[in-house]
Amino acid sequence: IHDWKTTRTVPGTDLPIWSTPWSTLRTLQQGTGPFMRLRDIVDQIPDDVVLAIDHKTTSSEDQRNTADLQAEERLFEYLDTAFGGHPERRVIWKIFAKGTSAARAKARGYRTMAMLYPAEVPAADLGSWDIIGMEWSASAEVWNRINASGRPTIAHIITNEGQARTALDKGASGLMASFPSRVHP
Protein backbone atom coordinates (compact mmCIF):
# COMPACT_ATOMS: atom_id res chain seq x y z
CA ILE A 1 0.00 0.00 0.00
CA HIS A 2 1.65 3.19 -1.18
CA ASP A 3 -0.33 6.07 0.30
CA TRP A 4 -1.24 6.83 3.92
CA LYS A 5 -4.93 7.01 2.97
CA THR A 6 -7.06 5.41 0.26
CA THR A 7 -8.23 8.75 -1.17
CA ARG A 8 -6.04 8.83 -4.29
CA THR A 9 -5.86 5.13 -5.07
CA VAL A 10 -9.53 4.25 -4.51
CA PRO A 11 -11.67 7.22 -5.60
CA GLY A 12 -14.66 7.85 -3.37
CA THR A 13 -12.90 6.58 -0.24
CA ASP A 14 -10.87 8.32 2.46
CA LEU A 15 -9.72 5.55 4.79
CA PRO A 16 -6.55 5.89 6.89
CA ILE A 17 -4.40 2.82 6.25
CA TRP A 18 -3.03 2.68 9.80
CA SER A 19 -6.42 2.34 11.48
CA THR A 20 -8.59 0.59 8.90
CA PRO A 21 -8.98 -3.16 9.46
CA TRP A 22 -7.52 -5.44 6.82
CA SER A 23 -10.99 -6.99 6.44
CA THR A 24 -12.08 -3.62 4.96
CA LEU A 25 -8.94 -2.78 2.96
CA ARG A 26 -8.85 -6.14 1.21
CA THR A 27 -12.27 -5.47 -0.34
CA LEU A 28 -11.12 -2.26 -2.09
CA GLN A 29 -10.09 -2.15 -5.75
CA GLN A 30 -7.37 0.15 -7.06
CA GLY A 31 -6.69 0.67 -10.75
CA THR A 32 -4.10 -2.12 -10.63
CA GLY A 33 -6.25 -4.55 -8.65
CA PRO A 34 -6.98 -5.28 -5.01
CA PHE A 35 -4.82 -4.18 -2.10
CA MET A 36 -2.41 -6.91 -1.10
CA ARG A 37 -0.34 -7.52 2.00
CA LEU A 38 3.39 -7.94 1.56
CA ARG A 39 3.22 -11.52 2.78
CA ASP A 40 0.62 -12.32 0.11
CA ILE A 41 2.91 -10.95 -2.58
CA VAL A 42 5.95 -12.78 -1.20
CA ASP A 43 3.97 -16.03 -1.15
CA GLN A 44 2.98 -15.64 -4.82
CA ILE A 45 6.02 -14.27 -6.66
CA PRO A 46 8.33 -16.51 -8.66
CA ASP A 47 11.84 -17.11 -7.34
CA ASP A 48 13.41 -14.92 -10.03
CA VAL A 49 11.46 -11.77 -9.10
CA VAL A 50 13.20 -9.02 -7.14
CA LEU A 51 11.10 -6.63 -5.06
CA ALA A 52 11.85 -2.95 -4.42
CA ILE A 53 10.59 -2.29 -0.89
CA ASP A 54 10.62 0.84 1.21
CA HIS A 55 9.57 1.34 4.79
CA LYS A 56 7.59 4.54 4.29
CA THR A 57 8.38 6.31 7.55
CA THR A 58 12.11 5.59 7.55
CA SER A 59 12.80 5.82 3.81
CA SER A 60 12.10 9.52 3.34
CA GLU A 61 13.92 11.31 6.15
CA ASP A 62 16.52 11.02 8.90
CA GLN A 63 14.19 9.09 11.17
CA ARG A 64 14.68 9.21 14.92
CA ASN A 65 11.25 8.01 16.05
CA THR A 66 11.82 4.86 18.12
CA ALA A 67 8.54 3.22 17.11
CA ASP A 68 9.23 3.79 13.40
CA LEU A 69 12.74 2.39 13.73
CA GLN A 70 11.35 -0.66 15.55
CA ALA A 71 8.80 -1.14 12.76
CA GLU A 72 11.63 -0.98 10.22
CA GLU A 73 13.52 -3.60 12.23
CA ARG A 74 10.45 -5.86 12.21
CA LEU A 75 10.28 -5.48 8.41
CA PHE A 76 13.95 -6.45 8.10
CA GLU A 77 13.29 -9.48 10.33
CA TYR A 78 10.21 -10.49 8.31
CA LEU A 79 12.15 -10.26 5.04
CA ASP A 80 14.99 -12.30 6.53
CA THR A 81 12.55 -15.05 7.51
CA ALA A 82 10.48 -14.86 4.30
CA PHE A 83 13.54 -15.21 2.08
CA GLY A 84 15.33 -17.94 4.00
CA GLY A 85 17.95 -15.76 5.62
CA HIS A 86 19.02 -14.10 2.36
CA PRO A 87 16.58 -11.30 1.54
CA GLU A 88 19.39 -9.34 -0.10
CA ARG A 89 19.04 -11.73 -3.06
CA ARG A 90 15.37 -10.85 -3.57
CA VAL A 91 14.91 -7.32 -2.22
CA ILE A 92 16.24 -3.90 -3.17
CA TRP A 93 15.82 -1.40 -0.33
CA LYS A 94 14.21 1.76 -1.77
CA ILE A 95 14.67 5.17 -0.20
CA PHE A 96 14.47 8.85 -1.02
CA ALA A 97 17.35 11.35 -1.04
CA LYS A 98 16.86 12.45 2.57
CA GLY A 99 16.27 8.96 3.92
CA THR A 100 18.91 7.38 6.14
CA SER A 101 17.65 3.81 6.20
CA ALA A 102 20.01 2.92 3.34
CA ALA A 103 22.90 2.60 5.79
CA ARG A 104 20.94 0.13 7.93
CA ALA A 105 19.92 -1.83 4.82
CA LYS A 106 23.48 -1.90 3.45
CA ALA A 107 24.72 -3.18 6.82
CA ARG A 108 22.39 -6.16 6.25
CA GLY A 109 23.68 -6.74 2.71
CA TYR A 110 20.86 -5.14 0.73
CA ARG A 111 21.35 -3.24 -2.50
CA THR A 112 19.80 0.22 -2.26
CA MET A 113 17.84 2.37 -4.69
CA ALA A 114 17.29 6.09 -4.22
CA MET A 115 14.32 7.69 -5.92
CA LEU A 116 15.50 11.19 -6.76
CA TYR A 117 13.96 14.27 -8.29
CA PRO A 118 15.86 16.72 -10.53
CA ALA A 119 16.28 19.41 -7.85
CA GLU A 120 17.98 16.87 -5.55
CA VAL A 121 20.68 15.78 -8.00
CA PRO A 122 23.16 18.68 -7.57
CA ALA A 123 23.56 17.95 -3.83
CA ALA A 124 23.26 14.17 -4.06
CA ASP A 125 26.18 11.79 -3.57
CA LEU A 126 25.19 9.46 -6.40
CA GLY A 127 27.74 6.91 -5.23
CA SER A 128 25.76 6.36 -2.03
CA TRP A 129 23.24 4.03 -3.66
CA ASP A 130 23.43 1.01 -5.93
CA ILE A 131 20.57 2.09 -8.20
CA ILE A 132 19.39 5.62 -9.01
CA GLY A 133 15.76 6.44 -9.74
CA MET A 134 14.80 9.61 -11.63
CA GLU A 135 11.63 11.13 -13.06
CA TRP A 136 11.25 10.05 -16.66
CA SER A 137 10.65 13.68 -17.67
CA ALA A 138 13.85 15.07 -16.14
CA SER A 139 16.09 17.03 -18.47
CA ALA A 140 18.79 15.40 -20.57
CA GLU A 141 21.34 17.21 -18.37
CA VAL A 142 20.00 15.51 -15.24
CA TRP A 143 19.86 12.12 -16.94
CA ASN A 144 23.42 12.57 -18.24
CA ARG A 145 24.63 13.26 -14.71
CA ILE A 146 22.98 10.24 -13.14
CA ASN A 147 24.01 8.00 -16.05
CA ALA A 148 27.61 9.19 -15.58
CA SER A 149 27.50 7.67 -12.07
CA GLY A 150 27.80 4.25 -13.67
CA ARG A 151 24.88 2.98 -11.61
CA PRO A 152 21.78 1.32 -13.07
CA THR A 153 18.96 3.84 -13.43
CA ILE A 154 15.21 3.49 -13.04
CA ALA A 155 12.77 5.99 -14.57
CA HIS A 156 9.66 6.78 -12.52
CA ILE A 157 6.70 6.89 -12.63
CA ILE A 158 5.85 5.65 -16.11
CA THR A 159 2.18 5.58 -17.14
CA ASN A 160 2.35 4.99 -20.91
CA GLU A 161 4.53 3.61 -23.66
CA GLY A 162 5.63 7.07 -24.87
CA GLN A 163 7.05 7.93 -21.45
CA ALA A 164 8.80 4.57 -21.39
CA ARG A 165 10.43 5.25 -24.77
CA THR A 166 11.48 8.75 -23.66
CA ALA A 167 13.07 7.41 -20.48
CA LEU A 168 14.88 4.59 -22.26
CA ASP A 169 16.14 7.06 -24.88
CA LYS A 170 17.59 9.16 -22.03
CA GLY A 171 19.50 6.14 -20.78
CA ALA A 172 17.23 4.61 -18.15
CA SER A 173 18.07 0.96 -17.64
CA GLY A 174 14.71 0.17 -16.05
CA LEU A 175 11.19 1.50 -15.54
CA MET A 176 8.93 1.89 -12.51
CA ALA A 177 5.28 1.69 -13.50
CA SER A 178 1.95 1.16 -11.81
CA PHE A 179 0.64 -0.65 -14.91
CA PRO A 180 3.60 -2.58 -16.37
CA SER A 181 1.43 -4.13 -19.09
CA ARG A 182 0.71 -0.64 -20.47
CA VAL A 183 4.33 0.43 -20.76
CA HIS A 184 6.39 -2.68 -21.45
CA PRO A 185 8.75 -1.75 -24.29
PLM segments and residue spans:
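Solvent-exposed loop/turn segments at secondary-structure junctions
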Residues: 4-7, 49, 56-61, 97-100, ...
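Structural detector of well-ordered beta-strand residues that form the stable sheet scaffold
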Residues: 52, 92-94, 113, 154
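Aromatic/hydrophobic pocket-lining residues that form the small-molecule binding cavity
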Residues: 34, 38, 72-75, 160
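Boundary/entry segment of secreted carbohydrate-active catalytic domains
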Residues: 3, 111-113
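C-terminal active-site rim and adjoining tail of enzyme catalytic domains
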Residues: 113-185
